[in-house]
């Protein structure tokens, strides 16, 4: 008889510009049992993004076909684009015993928690709204209208932080990374099953 952890779904959410994507990237480097859930999206690729690695980029028509075929664990419209989590890919990783890391918003969290077990949710806050706005401006990837839209959306997203299992303030990147990894390790210790081989 061999002991093995069941795969967990670990969700990171935050307003845009809080460091969530950078934290996810570093978590994947330091934890060999984590795998990233790659979302399907209708948005255009940003500079340096690769189809099948960062996202699966699809047209609106292709995305809607996947919705009709019930291929998503969850999906939502964010800003003017659709994002969805491919169901079979996640199931395969969990079955292999990996923990699957998600980078999704509160709408996706609600949907996944309704349909799936072993879900751990972590909301990442900026130190302040003012610092968040400055981070968005420093990124220099969005125009003024998009920044205003992201700031409005941030207020809405932050209002859902109390729905998460954990809330972490990203005021120091390396400390925030350490806290999130400690949460994951502790949750694994609570979630194991034995399998006969």
UniProtKB/Swiss-Prot annotation:
Q: Which E.C. number(s) belong to this protein?
A: 2.7.4.8
Residues annotated for ATP binding in this entry: 14-21
Q: Which residues form the Guanylate kinase-like domain?
A: 7-185
Which SUPFAM superfamilies does its entry note?
P-loop containing nucleoside triphosphate hydrolases (SSF52540)
Q: Which residues form a coiled coil?
A: none
> What are the GO MF terms of this UniProt record?
ATP binding; guanylate kinase activity
What are the entry keywords? ATP-binding, Cytoplasm, Kinase, Nucleotide-binding, Transferase
Would the keyword Transport be found if you checked this record's keyword annotation? no
* SMART domains assigned: GuKc (SM00072)
Principal location class: cytoplasm
Q: Which InterPro entries match?
A: GK/Ca_channel_bsu, Guanylate_kin-like_dom, Guanylate_kinase, Guanylate_kinase_CS, P-loop_NTPase
Outline what the protein does.
Essential for recycling GMP and indirectly, cGMP.
As for family, the record states:
Belongs to the guanylate kinase family.
Supply the name of the protein: Guanylate kinase
Q: Which organism is it from?
A: Rickettsia prowazekii (strain Madrid E)
UniProt lists the gene as gmk
